[in-house]
Amino acid sequence: PHDGENQTNTAVTSPAIAPSQTPLPPISTPTPTPPPVPSPDVGGGASSTVPDANPEHLKNAPLYITSILDPDDKSLPRLDCPRPDISRYQYLKPSTTLKKPKFFIALNIREKADLLPRLLGSIVEALHFLGPENCALSIVEGNSGDGTYEILHLLRPEIEKLGTEYHFSRSDLDPGAGDRIPKLAELRNMALAPLVSGGPSKYAADAVVLFLNDVAICLEDILELAHQRLYLGADMTCGFDWTYVGADPTFYDVWISRTIAGDSFFEIPADGNWNSAWNIFWNEDTSRRRFFDHKPLQVFSCWNGAVAMTARPLLDRLVRFRAPSPGECFQGEPQLFCKDLWNAGFGKIAVVPSVDLEYSDEAGRKIKAAKGYTSQWVGREDEVQDFRVDWKADPPEKVKCMARYDKQTWEPWNQALE
């Protein structure tokens, strides 16, 4: 789910969203249903093991699976990604095979078959890099009609053959009908359910969650978020997601993200226009300078297309995704998640300006051309003065509430938690 789309249930108006950014799906039951395991043969004989499958999509699925599994495959179009700097990220891979998975990769997705060669291709590259046996992959799919379901279903034997634990389920939850935020929260919790239910007995004590939106992402983007979380001593690191509503990219997740001063990343007046989107961190000099210097900066909340975070508060069941409580500012589930992280003592949350993402291959090419690939901005941080974040232990006293653009208020950061 796209976090900015949480706005559709409010009086908040946002710029037109690219066609690639489709809302999540209609659904009938709120609980995910694990599909039966298909035959390893992804050819025509697999249809009997894929319930509700479209025969045409089943026929096309092997082409996508081949592309997903082979980073050099050119049969389907996708964002070109550079090979990552092995030496920079090698330390992320455990030196010995772990008895418990350390990396939990989570994803909610619907109607994104065209993006799978890049998105799932990068995830599979991450499995290989980090050690397939050290990883678990959890995907909740939302009744796609474009082949996404069939591809992800038939991918199971290939992922399991690598040695990675693969959790795949469908959900009929429709965030577009009725209250949106509770459903988006439930979908995210579904993706995390194997981690939470498995708990500390099944997952490593220092486990990491890599939670991705349906973005055009490279392996180096995923690894950089994981690296910066460790390098900075952060609890959570986010990239930056962008959208093209005109010729220039606009920061997308403005409804969710709040600066360490509690404000939105750019100013949105009462009429809801995004004309000041270019003026990011306009009222916070330190954050603005660090952003343009491509140095990570502490924030109150973020999501921004992809995050790396410690699994500790999830394993200990201190936080989960949720909707606003009575008397609490109407806000999106990722902002509430960050608020609850602060409340649980996990307030080292940072955005990483070197990781720039968009929601389609075509727009991904544009954003990488405009903002640069991650590898163009990283390296030699130890030689850069004040690269590391000077963490603030306390959250801002108040945080901007944007339940409606025409009625923005400042509320205590821990409103409804006191």
PLM feature segments, named:
Residues 1-6, 10, 25, 38-125:
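N-proximal low-complexity "stem/linker" segments adjacent to membrane-targeting elements
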Residues 102-104, 136, 336:
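Cell-envelope/extracellular polymer assembly enzymes that use nucleotide-activated donors
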Residues 133-145, 171:
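Short beta-strand/loop segment that forms part of the nucleotide-sugar
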Residues 147-206:
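Active-site-proximal specificity loops/subdomain of glycosyltransferases
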Residues 201-217:
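Short beta-strand-to-loop acidic/aromatic patch adjacent to the donor-nucleotide binding site
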Residues 216-321, 387-396, 400-416:
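Conserved catalytic core of nucleotide-sugar-dependent glycosyltransferases
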Residues 296-298, 305-307, 312-316, 323-358:
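Catalytic donor-sugar/metal-binding loop of nucleotide-sugar-dependent glycosyltransferases
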Residues 321, 344-368, 377-383:
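Active-site donor/metal-binding and catalytic loop motifs
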